[in-house]
Structure formats: structure tokens, C-alpha cells
Amino acid sequence: MLNFSDISYAERGMVATINSNRLKDKGVGQYQNAYNYKNQNFEDLRASCLKMGELFEDPFFPAEPQSIGFKELGPKSQEVHNVYWQRPKDIIHNPQFITNDFSPTDICQGILGDCWLLAAIGSLTTSPKLLFRVVPRSQSFKKNYAGIFHFQLWQFGHWLNVVVDDRLPTKNNKLVFVHASHRQEFWGALLEKAYAKLNGSYEALTGGSTMEGLEDFTGGMAQCIRLQNPPHNLLRLLRKALEKSSLMGCSIEVTNSDDVEKMAHNMLVKGHAYAITGLQDVYYRDKLETLIRIQNPWGRIEWNGAWSDKAKEWEEVMPEVQMQLLHKKEDGEFWMSYEDFMSNFTLLEICNLTPDALSSWDYKSCWHTTFFEGSWRRGSTAGGCRNYPETFWSNPQFRISLPETDDPEDSSDKSEMVCTCLVALMQKNWRHAREGPQLLTIGFVVFSVWYVQFQNLQDIHLKKDFFMKYRDHGFSEIFTNTREVNSHLRLPPGEYVIIPSTFEPHKDADFLLRVFTEKHSETWLLDEVNMLEQLQEETITDADLDQNSVELFETLANRDSQVDMYDLQKLLNKMSSKVKSFKSKGFSLDVCRRMVNLMDKDDSGKLGLHEFHILWKKIKKWMEIFKECDQDRSGNLNSYEMRLAIEKAGIRMNNRVTEVVVARYADANMIVDFDNFINCFLRLKAMFAFFLSMDTKKTGSICLNINQWLHITMWG
């Protein structure tokens, strides 16, 4: 019996994509119906362990060196020397999963450089509703304990249920990585382990932004604001973000690697991720002072300036305010003035939440959200940025309609009628490739277009001439080598096209494009519909027959005046060699078989004289299309030209089909000769013909049994 492992990687990818899309259509991947990561079902695994009287051991993230790291934390590293994996019950008496008095200061950083992740976790603890979406609180080390725990994490548009065992790396009976400020609590360490499993290893978590962690814990969209040049309404944005239960982080960026996690005289750490946990106005010296509360994920080392724990400013505020806000202990959490915040920090990150993460009373503050998964594939859909006009048009394209303006900040202000639109482009799975490829430089361009330009363009992939004509309409061109690139846009109502791309062409990657708007909007993929155009069939009369070709046909034909695919190959190669204006290496036997299939009307497997001449007429037309699309007159097509040539010949393909076609018929340099062009075109034409002949009710779908499927795919 054929196993899934017998299928090629490319075929597995196609099957996986189809199955994934089917599950997505059923709602799998939403928070309420998360995917089981690695197909591991928590309830089933726990029940099995309880029945067998065993503690769970995760085969997909084993208690072995490769789960810890591969380079700085690799098996030969001193950092992991004498590291042992232990379960909490073996580390301490009466371990607790989570206690009721959790706070941002519960979680402390270990030897791993993932302060960005801890800052995100710290922000998460300020909202129990969000925390318990990620950390199901019904778990414990007592009732139904089987050494297995699970967490809900968001990855690239989908929620995943990630299972881990509770074996944790320790040294001298102490946790090596994340640990609680009081040793009995283990939810933070196990959450870090689940996140490490999702990304391949603990070391894969080294270096990142708080924004990344916030998004993966909430499914929200993060904004990045440079505080050297802040928006004029930044304080209002901060207040609004806290009102919406948004999660926030801040940091002091460094330009010199030697300054990373270097402490300034005021005890702020450069290149270190902090969480913003509150905002408060207090009366100080007869005026209102805005304070901002910040938390250091280390659980220690606090700001020592104005409004710090021991600062004299607290002596001049009301005692009840002191009691409410001031906690004099070394817990990593501190207050500072808004002015000092702006003077010291350089980067602010805000994670805007999706509707499902908000309470019902927050409905008015919900964003309208849309997301698309896509890919860039070398030779087909990886066209690069606008610096490469010959291929830029081949990138995936998305149309957005913004018909409704935001509510004005002041009901009396009608001067600025705009639509707030957050656009974010994320590249997938880059942490999994830490030992190989790194982050690509990605970005997007937004084109403003008139509605009239889009009439009758619902299902058409815009071509090069469109972008050359409307080149000046493109804006918001941002390219960086980060996991995500985003932009906070305030646009007039209208129609727009978003083009996500890598900076350079021919770079393979998968991406997620998300659009958040304050008001109703419509966003969809702008792509071709797979379609075979009904072109007029060629006919031929006796007067059209060329005497030389007739004689050549008769010398190769059998006694019935017909040629099979072997004779057809000889015939076509002789005739094409006489076409001096056309360069060809000859026709392969596979192409000749497809031609016989296309033209054979009586199922004889052979062609008669008239059938052959109609075929030759078609071939000459295909030669003209090939030459027309061969812009550099090289005698071959590049893969982008092939797509245009196939369209001119009567077949429109969407991006997914184009990616498969290029992978199958282009060579290593993305070049397609005439034989492969014809082979591809005839295969597509045959598959369309099979499908349309069986889809008698024009439903767009057919049902086949295994015999029919094999017959069509093997003969097509």
C-alpha cells in the first residue's frame, strides 16, 4: 500500500495545502477551533498516559541537546554543560502550575536572550482574559496530572494547540531558562517551552521584538512607533491603546552591538525589551502629571530617576495615591514621567487586538480584520520590488476598498475625512531556518487607483503596463529584513491595490498579509480565474494544403494514410527545421503524444492528413506567440514570459497554478524552451478539456473514483 512518505516533497506540499484550505473553510485555525500542532491532541494524549500510568514524553521536542540549541547553546557549549532535564515535581515539593496572584513580575529571564518574549508575557499578565486564552488555567500538577500541558499560540494567521511534556532544562536543580520569582510556579517556564517547540529550539528564541511575542500570544497586529519622531497625538494613542486592552512594549535601540543590554546611569538597559503596563495622571505641585508604568522582565534593575520607587516626587502626592501606585520593592516594575519616557526610550510597540480577543463591552473599539496567506515563488510570483519593472507585476496583488471614513476625534471636526488602515506583511517560519537562511528583506507598495479602472477587473491579475502607467500612484514603500513590516495609513476613501514583495526578485518565501481598518472595508486577492478561452477552431481545405508537406506526410504515413506519435515526431522535426525564423531543438515524444491526444477525434491514436495540417496550423500560431513573448529574442522564454504566452494562447492561470507550472516546466535558470512551452500548454489544455467535459452542470467541481482519477492524470 502507498504511504504518505512515498509521495515527493512537492506533492506532499500540494496535498497539505489542499487539506489545510479545506480545514480553514471549516473554521479550523480560529481560536475556538485551534489546530492540533504536530497532530497531537492534548485530551487524547493525557487520557492515554493516565490509563497506562505513565508520564508523557514528547517525541517532537525530546529532552535532548537539539531541543536546547544548535550553536551558542549547541551540545558542545559550556552554557549547556551539566544541564539536566527534570520535571517540576523533582525540582521542588508541591509545584504549582499558576497561582491567582500572577503579575508582570512573576516571570524572570534565564540565560536565554529572549527578554523580548518575557516582556510580551509580562504584558499578557496585565489582562487575565488574554492570559487564560494562551494558558488554559484548568491544568495542574495534582488533578489528572500526567506530565503533559498545553498552550494556545497564534502563528501566521492560525491558532495552534501546542502540547509539551513538563521536563525542563535545569542546572544544580534550578531552571536554566524562564523561571518564576517564587519557585513553585511553572506556567511561564512551560509556556516558553511550548514557544520553543513551535520555533524549533530554545536557542531559536534568541533575539526578537516584543511585538513578535505580543502578536503570537494574541493574534493581534502590532504597530512600531519611533519616539524620536512621534505622531502629534501619541499620548492619546497610548490612552486609547490601554482602553482597548492593547498590549505594549518599549525599548532603547542601540547602534553598536557592544551596547546591547548595557546599563545607563539611570539604570535603564539599552537594547532591552520592557513592557508598558499602565498610565496614570496624578496631581503634583498643583498641576497634572502623566506617569507611565513600565516593567523590566528581569524582575529587577529599575529606573532610578524621577518617580522611581524611592524618588522624592512621591512625597508631594496624596497618601491614597501613594498607596495605590507606589510599591517599594525590587520587582522590575517602576513609574516614570511621560516626559522622561519620551526622553529615554526610542521605540514603542503597540499590539492591536482582534475582535475575538476583546470583551463584548469592547465591541465599539474592534478593528475590522482581514488576512491572506500567500507565497513568493522563484520564476512565477517572486517579482521583487518596483526596481524590477519586468517582474514586479508578477507578485501577488490585493485589492482593498475603503468606502467609509473614521469617526472624527471631535464630533464638530469635519475637516479631515480619512480611513485608518493598518497593513502588515509577515514572512513565515524564519526562526525554523536559523541554521540556514535568514530573514529576507520584505515590504509592500500601496497603489491608489480610480474606481473606474477596476470596472470589469474583478478577476484579473494586473500586468506590467498597468504599473508602468500608474507608477506615480504607488506609496508607503517600506522594505526591511524583519519578520513583519507594517504601516499605519490614513487614506482618503477609495480603491487601492497592495503589492507585497521581497526586495529582490526570485526569493522563495511564504507570507501573511493582514489589513485592519476602523470602519467597514473589503479586501480580496486580485488574481486570475483558471479558464480556458473558447477560441475559434482552425479549419483547413484542400486548397490550403502545402504540396511539400503532403508528400512528407505520405512518406511517413502507414497504409491507412495516418501517423502515430512516433511518425509525428519525425514529421514535425523535419518541418520545423525548415522554419528558418524559428529556433527549436525539436519536438519530444511526450509532446507528440499530447498532440495526438489533442487532435485525435476517433480514438485511433493516430492522425490523418487533414488532422495533421490543422495541427501544423496551430503549431505555427503557437510559434508566433512564442516569438512575440520572447522579448530579448533569445529563442527561449523566461518563466514570466511563459505565463504571458500561455495566456495569449488562450489559457488563464491563477498564481497557485502558475507556481506549479513554472516548477514543473522551467529549468534551473527559469528558462522555458519551445518544446516545454508546448508540452505545458497541451497538458493544461487537456486537463481543462477533461474537467469541462465532466462538469456537465457547470458547478466548478467534479467527483471521480480512483480509477477515473488515475486514468485522467496518467493520460492527460
Swiss-Prot record:
It comes from the Eukaryota. Gene3D superfamilies: 2.60.120.380, Cysteine proteinases (3.90.70.10), EF-hand (1.10.238.10). Its main location: cytoplasm. PROSITE patterns: CALPAIN_CAT, EF_HAND_1, EF_HAND_2, THIOL_PROTEASE_CYS. GO terms for biological process: proteolysis. Residues 529-544 are annotated as: Linker. InterPro entries: C2_III, Calpain_cysteine_protease, Calpain_domain_III, Calpain_III, Calpain_III_sf, EF-hand-dom_pair, EF_Hand_1_Ca_BS, EF_hand_dom. GO terms for molecular function: calcium ion binding; calcium-dependent cysteine-type endopeptidase activity. It is found in: Cytoplasmic vesicle, Secretory vesicle, Acrosome. The keyword NAD does not apply. Ca(2+) 1 binds at residues 600, 602, 604, 606, 611. GO terms for cellular component: acrosomal vesicle; cytoplasm. The active site is at 115, 272, 296. Its EC number is 3.4.22.-. Belongs to the peptidase C2 family. Calcium-regulated non-lysosomal thiol-protease which catalyzes limited proteolysis of substrates involved in cytoskeletal remodeling and signal transduction. Heterodimer of a large (catalytic) and a small (regulatory) subunit. This is Calpain 11. It comes from Rattus norvegicus.
